[in-house]
Regions:
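N-terminal intrinsically disordered/low-complexity leader segments
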Residues: 1-11
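Helix-turn-helix
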Residues: 15, 23-65
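Short helix-coil transition/hinge motifs at the ends and kinks of transmembrane helices
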Residues: 81-82, 122-130, 186-199
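Helical hydrophobic small-molecule/effector-binding pocket
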Residues: 87-124, 144-147, 173-180, 184
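C-terminal peripheral helix-coil segments that are non-catalytic and often amphipathic
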Residues: 99-100, 140, 144-156, 170-218
């Protein structure tokens, strides 16, 4: 029997994930079943289960694909070693977040939002899904790197926070979370608050950067 190449195996795996992605775009991700994915691929049940043994492994792979999209972790690492001012590096980190989030809105963000909500409500599913993910989550990593710059440069006296530093760091993380949530609801589900039209994620993140600089005394 001829040996199947690794390239072929990766192509079949990608084919199944692409099918799962399309199903998740049409219905709530947490309602997708392995049967849905088998039907979407046109493969046999065994042909799908050879690569993914349950829906949790599919979810984990989709989350990994989202976090690997665009190579943002590498971009963040490159920003962190630049010989530039702290505020310039922070601005680049926030800009990278803008671009990544904009790309996610037209691709994975609906799926990520639905799965994160599902995992919060179902701890067992959370363990089964996130226990299989391998890629570094982008936004927590970005927040960690931004925090490292802010903390270290506050310790040197470069930044002079106008309120306690822990409050600023909490503000940044909670603001990012709020922007991601509200823009996702607005653009993926057409939900908006009274008097509020379409939200612009780039303007919101840019405003967050400017607010952060003010809070840091710059």
């Amino acid at each position: 029997m001829p040996k199947v190449s690794e390239e072929y195996l990766q192509e079949k795996r990608k084919e199944i994930l692409d099918a799962a992605f399309e199903v998740c775009r049409r219905k709530p991700a947490y309602e997708v079943t392995m049967s849905d994915i088998v039907s979407e691929t046109g493969l046999s049940q065994g042909g799908v289960y050879k690569y993914f043994n349950n829906i949790y492994s599919v979810y984990a792979a989709l989350i990994d694909e989202a976090n690997l999209a665009g190579g943002l972790i590498h971009e963040i690492d490159c920003i962190m070693v630049l010989d530039e001012s702290p505020e310039a590096k922070l601005e680049k980190l926030f800009k990278a977040a803008e671009n990544f989030f904009s790309e996610m809105l037209i691709s994975y963000n609906k799926i990520l939002f639905e799965l994160s909500t599902y995992c919060i409500q179902n701890p067992d599913a959370d363990r089964k899904i996130n226990g299989q993910t391998k890629a570094v989550p982008v936004f927590p990593y970005l927040a960690k790197c931004a925090s490292e710059i802010i903390i270290s440069q506050t310790q040197t006296g470069y930044f002079k926070p106008v309120i306690p530093l822990p409050d600023i760091l909490t503000f940044i993380v909670s603001s990012f979370d709020g922007i991601i949530r509200d823009v996702t609801l607005n653009k993926c589900y057409n939900i908006s608050s009274d008097g509020m039209t379409e939200l612009d994620e780039k303007k919101l993140i840019s405003t967050l950067y400017l607010s952060t600089m003010k809070l840091l005394g710059n």
